[in-house]
Amino acid sequence: EMLRSLVGSEMCIRDRTLYQIQWKYRDEARPRYGLLRSREFLMSDGYSFDRDEAGMDVSYMNEYGAYERIFTRCGLDYRIVEADNGPIGGSRSHEFSALSNVGESELAHCPECGYAATLERAECVDDEPVQEEMEELKSVYTPGTKTIEDVCNYLHMDVKKSIKALMFVTYDDELNPAEYVCAFVRGDREVNMIKLVNALGIPEHYIEFANEDEMGATTGCVGGFTGPVGLQNCKIVVDSELVGTVNMCAGANKEDHHMTGVCYGRDYKGDIVTDIKVLKEGERCPKCGKPVIEHSRGIEVGQIFKLGTKYSESMKAFYKDENGNDCVYQMGCYGIGITRTLQAIIEQHNDENLSLIHI
């Protein structure tokens, strides 16, 4: 807000980038790894204000290049990855991540084409559905088979022919329960929570796993035996890979029972259909298509964002154009964790002979 006031007070057409370096304080629940996650840390924050999107793009890439040079000169082995914008918002973000086994960022990377993204942001390439004749929908007795592995072993079925269900409850701005959500992915997949909340259009902290009994009373689901057929009073989110699948196995919403012959479109449909799964190692790269995706961990040392007009509109960061009209700035924001960068350097360059005099 202070920087917005500085820029807005000039009331002129002038693209600019401002920065600040200051100590910040956070009520960190689990401080750990020295300077990596502490309650007190030093940050460098930059903000760009441009008259149009083209100018914002230039400012963004200027900061991108500057961060590359900074971390290279620091001697870091780092990777630039596409990142989720998270609560900050905006249209695009890149994270600068120093590779380290103690890092909290999970990364997906293609060694062939260079595609890289945080695991929460990484796109998936859907497998093509198997073409076969639709079978009759049947309810099958499957006693004690509450996990995907249990039911697939019991029915002698490939796990890729099963449907996994996860049940959630979402909250409104007053943190009152808003609605139940059931997310469905193929049995060998995991739900990507960031993709799910983005699909729902809610903040990450507005969702949690539902109480099975409470949700069952409203929707008809049964813990361990939940499936998409016949669910009521809940939002159904279906992973895009399930579209077109036939003869799948899913919970029957009845204790000790599953449905076989489940076909998308005939037996159920999603209220929301999109990619909500985690990109696994060895899967196809979303950019070049080669099945060589690798996972690694990294320390987030910097991140940059294209914010657009999200904050400039709400904070009335205007400039006067050539005709004297009020126009909204296109904003970008850019941050480097200075103390975290120091810790990342130590993590990558330490040995048994390291002492404080060498730092």
Residue ranges and their predicted role:
Residues S9-E10, R30-G46, R51-T341, Q348, ...:
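Extended, low-hydrophobicity, polar/charged segments
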Residues T17, Y25:
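Acidic/histidine-enriched segments that form metal/cofactor-coordinating
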Residues Q20:
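Carboxylate/His-rich catalytic cores and anion/metal-binding grooves
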